[in-house]
């Protein structure tokens, strides 16, 4: 809530919820609306969830673990952090995050510069529109490639992905 003073207030449990399988997004601070140079997004992680490895060309992501054990891989750096743990994933590095534990996890992401928070909403809308379609999967859809290009995002399948999925007993990435 902006009280006309430039102060943005988001109470506990508030924010724009964006449904994504296994890895949701709750936008806490929207960069353009709130006049901030950053965006803040909370991500819940269901047990067994891993994000699709990806690379940002425009943003750095700073993650703070709030609950559970969350694994991070950014290029050659791999770490599992508990509550209070912090990691920066610089733009240009292929990275993924996963729930490394047996309980739901949650992180806060500070994304700089802001604007990327809109990707989650647009991805959710695309996944909803593609649900039930037969034929090529979401990643083969032209709309998916257009969305990734719009946000300077590339997806990949690095050689470390299968090892992480096996070691932590994860489900495969959802998109």
Name these PLM-found stretches:
Residues 4, 110-113, 117-134:
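A hydrophobic/aromatic-rich effector-binding and dimerization subdomain
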Residues 46-48, 83-84, 92, 102:
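Tight coil/turn sites that cap or link beta-strands
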Residues 40-46, 55-74, 110-113:
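Short, conserved beta-strand element in jelly-roll/cupin
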Residues 91-117:
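Ligand-binding loop in jelly-roll beta-barrel domains
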Residues 14-53, 59-60:
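A short glycine-rich, His/Asp/Glu-containing loop-to-beta-strand
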């Amino acid at each position: 809530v902006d009280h006309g003073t430039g102060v943005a207030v988001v109470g506990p449990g508030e924010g724009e919820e964006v449904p994504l399988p296994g890895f949701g997004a709750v936008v806490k601070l929207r960069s353009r609306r709130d006049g901030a140079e950053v965006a803040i997004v909370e991500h819940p992680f269901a047990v067994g969830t891993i994000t699709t490895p990806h690379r940002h060309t425009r943003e750095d992501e700073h993650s703070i673990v709030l609950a559970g054990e969350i694994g991070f891989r950014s290029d050659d750096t791999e770490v599992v952090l508990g509550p209070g743990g912090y990691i920066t994933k610089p733009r240009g590095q292929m990275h993924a995050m996963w729930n490394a534990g047996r309980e739901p996890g949650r992180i806060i992401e500070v994304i700089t510069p802001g604007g990327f928070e809109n990707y989650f909403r647009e991805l959710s809308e695309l996944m909803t529109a593609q649900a039930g379609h037969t034929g090529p999967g979401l990643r083969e859809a032209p709309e998916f490639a257009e969305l990734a290009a719009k946000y300077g995002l590339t997806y990949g399948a690095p050689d470390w992905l299968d090892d992480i999925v096996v070691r932590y007993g994860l489900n495969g990435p959802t998109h």
